[in-house]
Amino acid sequence: MKAQIWNKRIWINSYNPNELKEIFNKYLIDSGFKILGFQEHYFTPIGYTALWLLGESHFAIHTFPEECKSYIEISSCNVEYFNRFLKSVKQYKIIRENETKKV
């Protein structure tokens, strides 16, 4: 296997932790990723961050409720799963995204 990682960073206009966790967990599974672990943290008074450890790398969410948006980032060594995931995310509430990077 060649050492390559595909990465995408996206801002979305949703910041509800329950909605985000449910929809992105589904997108990851439907894309073929193997979820090895999941961690989340709720900030006081508001805010949320979550991290999925994947067999193929990782996915993270960071909410910014005061600005009504969230930042998501996916990194993957499996370009097929990565592209499936991005196709699912395109149906979601994207504000701004960076170009896909292969590292």
Region spans (language model):
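Polybasic/polar functional segments that serve as interface/processing modules
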Residues: M1-V103
